[in-house]
């Protein structure tokens, strides 16, 4: 099943990479979203904020490490990361939305139980695994014409703040709402060993490229999250770049841009 992009099917747009620190690109993105909203009113943004975290930790002379594409988050750092995601990154996006006339609401994964977050067992510190939650709050906000902007910070049942990978968070929000998903990043989509765009990807092909080391690190996390969403939602997921603003509306409307991931 392909992306439907209708007035009734929500679209979750995951934002990442250097986009969050590029004011011109953000303005172009929200301009495209304004046009898109005329044909599809139910839109949700999900974001991380790794670029802001890297800058903040560097200024504090704190080294940041990753394991298999996921940020290791010591408990002593979770306050800084929460501030970067929920504070800086979220409010930068809200500011652009307000500037372009959107009625925005900034959220975390904990608000209204929109997702269920548990402590990861992968030895990453204060990092959470994210699953679908209660759609009530998001459904009410979308019905009221609001644009939810969700940062990938969660809280588990014990009240612990947890850093959640934004690709995984976006997948969980899609499952909560039975929504379409587009992941925007710095690259055109999934690339092969020759750095050429792969137009279509499925789980078998992904496993081959992961085993060969072609897909690794952050892209491996992204592809696995997209495959999970494609399987659970029974629809295609798109991975594409934010760097071609003139094609963003076409992408959001389901036209052939970037890489299409199917189960």
UniProtKB/Swiss-Prot annotation:
Its main location: cytoplasm. GO terms for biological process: arginine biosynthetic process via ornithine; L-arginine biosynthetic process. Substrate binds at residues 49-50, 71, 163. InterPro entries: AceGlu_kinase-like_sf (IPR036393), AcgluKinase_fam (IPR004662), ArgB (IPR037528), Asp/Glu/Uridylate_kinase (IPR001048). It is found in: Cytoplasm. Pfam families: AA_kinase. Pathway: Amino-acid biosynthesis; L-arginine biosynthesis; N(2)-acetyl-L-ornithine from L-glutamate: step 2/4. One of its GO terms (molecular function) is ATP binding. It catalyses: N-acetyl-L-glutamate + ATP = N-acetyl-L-glutamyl 5-phosphate + ADP. The record marks 14, 222 as: Transition state stabilizer. Keywords: Amino-acid biosynthesis, Arginine biosynthesis, ATP-binding, Cytoplasm, Kinase, Nucleotide-binding, Transferase. Coiled coil: none annotated. Its EC number is 2.7.2.8. GO terms for cellular component: cytoplasm. Belongs to the acetylglutamate kinase family. ArgB subfamily. NCBIfam families: argB. Catalyzes the ATP-dependent phosphorylation of N-acetyl-L-glutamate. This is Acetylglutamate kinase.
């Amino acid at each position: 099943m392909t992306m439907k992009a209708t007035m009734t099917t929500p679209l979750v747009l995951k934002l990442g990479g250097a986009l969050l620190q590029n004011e011109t690109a953000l303005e172009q993105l929200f301009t495209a979203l304004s046009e898109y909203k005329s044909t599809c009113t139910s839109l949700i943004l999900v974001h991380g904020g790794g670029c802001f975290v890297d800058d903040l930790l560097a200024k504090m002379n704190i080294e940041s490490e990753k394991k298999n594409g996921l940020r290791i988050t010591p408990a002593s750092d979770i306050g800084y990361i929460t501030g970067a995601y929920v504070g800086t990154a979220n409010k930068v996006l809200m500011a652009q939305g307000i500037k372009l006339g959107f009625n925005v609401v900034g959220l975390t994964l904990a608000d209204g139980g929109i997702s269920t977050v548990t402590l990861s067992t992968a030895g990453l510190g204060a990092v959470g695994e994210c699953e679908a939650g209660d759609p009530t709050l998001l459904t009410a906000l979308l019905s009221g014409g609001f644009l939810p902007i969700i940062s990938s910070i969660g809280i588990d049942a014990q009240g612990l703040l947890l850093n959640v990978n934004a690709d995984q968070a976006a997948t969980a929000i899609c499952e909560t709402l039975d929504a379409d998903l587009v992941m925007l990043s710095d690259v055109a989509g999934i690339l092969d060993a020759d750095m050429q765009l792969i137009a279509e990807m499925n789980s078998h092909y992904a496993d081959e490229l992961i085993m060969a080391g072609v897909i690794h690190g952050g892209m491996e996390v992204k592809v696995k999250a997209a495959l999970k969403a494609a399987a659970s939602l029974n629809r295609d997921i798109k991975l594409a770049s934010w760097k071609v603003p003139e094609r963003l509306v076409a992408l959001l409307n389901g036209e052939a841009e970037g890489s299409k991931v199917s189960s």
